[in-house]
């Protein structure tokens, strides 16, 4: 016991000061994409053809990038001869509306807080039930790590619970396979109202690399109303945490 206490005193505090202090991320971190329309030529489609999920498209206003489909693979930036696309180190990606994930430049309408009455209920205590709907465990792992001493999700009043009956909402990962659809619906119905639905990762938002597969429902939006979208493949733990805190007005 004394050895344990001694080790604790020696290690001191290991929890990051986020959100009071901004995290320091490596230069290689692939965060929010940025499109420089001025560098892009109107007839070029090299990046769109290279994108594995059809996240890059061109309309009358220029290039658009759908972060809900984006795998953050960096292929578009790698093949662009004019370097009109790049990934910044900005980890803040969570939004409230699906259309806010369509980028035309560098600005993102970050997630706003819940409405006043809902915020009164969940602002200081938010219990979530996680549903892995045919996920690969990457998003699940980055959600799980929020419970470690580094991030300490519980200090914000947010916790994951074992039963949907004890939850205020569900957090979904995975592309929603046909075999998981019934389980997802039953979990949603078991959560008392009012309730929240959070889609984490490209798979849960759009189907990710499995888009239009006959066994996949292309994300949760076709089935449930989504209150928070957290794009990424997988999203960084800080991206998920930032979105959750914005939802309960802790940022």
Residue locations for each model-derived region?
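Iron-sulfur-associated redox domains of electron-transfer enzymes in respiratory
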Residues: 61-71, 77, 81, 86-251
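Non-ligating segments of multi-cofactor redox enzymes
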Residues: 1-50, 54-59, 78, 88-95, ...
